[in-house]
């Protein structure tokens, strides 16, 4: 039985307003206006054409806007839908079929046939439970079920799951930082040279932005690190315990979060001071280095200083230099320059060298152009074309013959016409000229008469042919118009 237009439009509009029904089941295009009444799914125009090509025995396509619907078809659309079809395929081993582009394989499979049987049973139950096809309780229950599924199943929405995971992770980090802020640990490290203990205090990690460390503690740490031997401070674990104080946590592979108390200003000052230190040398250090250099040149193996020289209030360790160390320093400098060049430093010098090479090559090309031979321009400048034999003076080319021909042609510069005998310098036969000039008039007239006779015969033939064509044309016209 066919439903009215108002009933079908009201029901289909409500069904198409659901989230999963707003996209095509096959390709995901938005706002589908076609549907497969066999499977209760919504399709776009292109996918509906593919379903129509499969045949009505597999999928029967109807328009949700223009076509008329039966109550049985509307029941299938009520209990079906894109979400129900997709979930059924996933639960019954049809995930690969959902991703397949072969519609005939997808909708002729065993899973699709089982889904058709399921739709038929659901349609019968729906008709028994809701006799009125426009019963809104069915739609409200459907909306409530879909909303509950959205709230419980977090894996369906990838982006919401990602946001929730990140929020949870940030909360855990805040808890860790709060626990760490409540406790602080200090570790005593003894220096290698002196018995004075150096206290390395671990700063508190707070949730608020990190504060810059005090200048006094920084100065103290620098002085202790310079005066003492190389001693590595022991960092306490992020969660110190009473039983294992100062024990290091097992290292883990992966990405580690940087500490929040990094002071980049201190790093910059240290780099600038290290760069400016070689440029500003005290007189004592300069004299000491000059003395060491002279001793190295004389072949002294080692130079030891008994007293340490104080530079800018900092103790300087004894300097030990030898000839081998000087050579190694020079080799290290050369290797360093090569490494810097390989990394890209010094590109301007390479560019200048390339420009110098290009300029030298251009000068060489210009010099070659100046020294190029001018034989072709001197000998063949006025000619339009030349041959290879003529250019190289070989084969059948004879320069003397060519010069003679040029002279012969120059003698006929003002002549309007020339003969072959006059060109090659042969004497003309006077008898032939006399006979041609003294021919009798009768022979001349005879030639004219013969020529005229032939022309007259040709004219007669042409006139006869024209008359025949004209008569044929007149007969055809008379036969066509009956006159």
Curated annotation (Swiss-Prot):
Record's signal peptide: none
Amino acid composition bias (Low complexity), ranges on this chain: 213-243
Matching SMART domains: ArfGap (SM00105)
Disulfide pairings: none
Localization terms from the record: Golgi apparatus
Basic and acidic residues composition-biased segments: 169-179, 191-205
Residue span, Arf-GAP domain: 9-128
GO biological process, one term: retrograde vesicle-mediated transport, Golgi to endoplasmic reticulum
Gene Ontology cellular component annotations, sorted alphabetically: COPI vesicle coat; endoplasmic reticulum-Golgi intermediate compartment; Golgi apparatus; Golgi membrane
Keywords: Golgi apparatus, GTPase activation, Metal-binding, Zinc, Zinc-finger
Zinc finger region(s), C4-type: 24-47
Gene3D superfamilies, per database record: Arf GTPase activating protein (1.10.220.150)
Family annotation (PANTHER family): ADP-RIBOSYLATION FACTOR GTPASE ACTIVATING PROTEIN 3, ISOFORM H, ADP-RIBOSYLATION FACTOR GTPASE ACTIVATING PROTEIN 3, ISOFORM H-RELATED
Described function: GTPase-activating protein for the ADP ribosylation factor (ARF) family. Involved in retrograde vesicular transport from the Golgi to the endoplasmic reticulum.
Protein name: ADP-ribosylation factor GTPase-activating protein glo3
UniProt organism field: Schizosaccharomyces pombe (strain 972 / ATCC 24843)
Lineage summary: Eukaryota, Fungi, Dikarya, Ascomycota, Taphrinomycotina
């Amino acid at each position: 039985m066919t439903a009215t237009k108002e009933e079908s439009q009201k029901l289909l509009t409500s069904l198409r307003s659901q989230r999963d029904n707003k996209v095509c089941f096959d390709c995901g295009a938005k706002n589908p206006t076609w549907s497969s009444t066999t499977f209760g799914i919504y399709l776009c125009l292109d996918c509906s054409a593919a379903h129509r090509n499969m045949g009505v025995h597999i999928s029967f396509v109807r328009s949700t806007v223009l076509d008329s619907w039966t109550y049985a078809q509307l029941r299938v659309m009520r209990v079906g839908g894109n979400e129900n079809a997709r979930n059924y395929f996933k639960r019954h081993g049809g995930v690969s079929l959902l991703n397949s582009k072969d519609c005939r394989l997808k909708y002729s499979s065993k899973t699709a046939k089982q889904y058709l049987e399921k739709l038929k049973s659901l349609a019968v139950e729906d008709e028994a439970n809701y006799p009125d096809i426009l019963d809104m309780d069915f739609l409200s229950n459907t909306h409530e079920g879909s909303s509950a599924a959205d709230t419980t199943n977090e894996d369906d929405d990838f982006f919401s799951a990602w946001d929730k995971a990140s929020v949870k992770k940030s909360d855990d980090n805040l808890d860790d930082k709060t626990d760490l802020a409540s406790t602080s640990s200090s570790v005593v490290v003894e220096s290698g040279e002196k018995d004075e203990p150096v206290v390395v205090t671990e700063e508190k990690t707070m949730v608020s932005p990190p504060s810059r460390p005090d200048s006094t503690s920084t100065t103290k740490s620098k002085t202790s690190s310079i005066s003492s031997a190389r001693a590595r401070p022991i960092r306490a674990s992020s969660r110190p315990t009473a039983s294992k104080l100062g024990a290091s946590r097992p290292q883990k592979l992966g990405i580690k979060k940087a500490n929040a108390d990094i002071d980049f200003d201190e790093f910059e000052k240290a780099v600038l001071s290290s760069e400016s230190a070689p440029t500003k040398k005290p007189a004592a250090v300069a004299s000491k280095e000059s003395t060491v250099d002279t001793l190295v040149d004389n072949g002294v193996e080692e130079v030891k200083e008994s007293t340490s020289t104080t530079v800018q209030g900092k103790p300087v360790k004894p300097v030990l230099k030898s000839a081998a160390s000087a050579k190694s320093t020079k080799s290290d400098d050369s290797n360093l320059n090569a490494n810097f060049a390989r990394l890209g430093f010094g590109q301007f010098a390479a560019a200048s060298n390339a420009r110098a090479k290009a300029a030298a090559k251009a000068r060489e090309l210009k010099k070659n152009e100046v020294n190029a031979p001018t034989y072709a321009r001197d000998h063949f400048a006025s000619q339009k074309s030349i041959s290879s034999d003529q250019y190289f003076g070989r084969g059948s080319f004879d320069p003397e013959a060519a010069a003679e021909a040029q002279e012969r042609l120059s003698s006929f510069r003002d002549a309007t016409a020339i003969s072959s005998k006059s060109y090659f310098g042969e004497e003309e036969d006077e008898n032939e000229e006399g006979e041609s000039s003294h021919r009798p008039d009768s022979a001349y007239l005879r030639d004219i008469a013969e020529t005229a006779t032939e022309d007259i015969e040709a004219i007669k033939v042409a006139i006869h042919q024209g008359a025949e064509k004209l008569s044929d044309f007149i007969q055809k016209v008379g036969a066509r118009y009956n006159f």
